[in-house]
């Protein structure tokens, strides 16, 4: 006879059965994920209303056409340009997914692809002048969202949290 979930639950000793599963809602990973989504949403909201963001891109952000995935390019693309595979790796995405994202950003005029002068077989993804304007508006939106965060939780908590996250993320966080 096959075990049912009720049989399995009954077979667990009292010590093995969590009496309170609230920990699943409040563990560090889940809180970090929710916090990151909230922060990214606020940055995109600020970008949508930024006088410094290129108008067409601000309109896309205002209509929720720009997502946190698009922010990956803004966060990870080197000012000197990046190979697609390196960009995907630093953003924690597959090369194919990053390729699709770069294609969309290229259509919006944020980035362009150019031959890599160090390797004729490779191509670099680079910011366009419009993309650099977007990057500056992104920098301003991040600074504004960070200031809001400090105001909400307090400067001391924000500082300790930032230092703790930098230590926890390790050296790859600033790479």
Predicted regions and their residues:
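Non-catalytic interaction surface on structured domains
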Residues: 28, 39, 91, 113, ...
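Charged, amphipathic alpha-helical coiled-coil/dimerization segments
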Residues: 103-162
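Alpha-helical linker/hinge and terminal dimerization helices associated
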Residues: 32-35, 39-50, 91, 134-152, ...
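Active-site phosphate/pyrophosphate-handling residues
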Residues: 27, 72, 133
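Carboxylate-rich helix-loop segments that flank metal/cofactor sites and access channels
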Residues: 69, 101-104
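N-terminal leader segment of winged-helix/HTH proteins
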Residues: 1-65
């Amino acid at each position: 006879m096959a075990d049912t979930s009720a049989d399995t639950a009954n077979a667990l000793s009292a010590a093995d059965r969590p009496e309170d599963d609230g920990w699943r809602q409040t563990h560090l990973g889940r809180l970090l994920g929710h916090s990151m989504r909230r922060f990214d949403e606020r940055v995109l909201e600020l970008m949508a209303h930024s006088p410094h963001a290129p108008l067409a891109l601000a309109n896309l952000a205002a209509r929720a056409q720009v997502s946190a995935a698009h922010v990956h390019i803004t966060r990870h693309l080197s000012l000197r340009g990046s190979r697609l595979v390196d960009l995907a790796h630093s953003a924690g995405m597959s090369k194919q997914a990053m390729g699709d994202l770069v294609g969309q950003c290229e259509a919006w005029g944020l980035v362009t692809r150019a031959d890599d002068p160090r390797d004729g077989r490779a191509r670099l993804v680079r910011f366009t002048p419009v993309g650099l304007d977007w990057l500056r508006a992104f920098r301003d939106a991040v600074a504004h969202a960070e200031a809001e965060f400090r105001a909400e939780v307090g400067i001391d908590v924000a500082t300790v949290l930032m230092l703790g996250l930098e230590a926890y993320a390790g050296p790859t966080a600033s790479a």
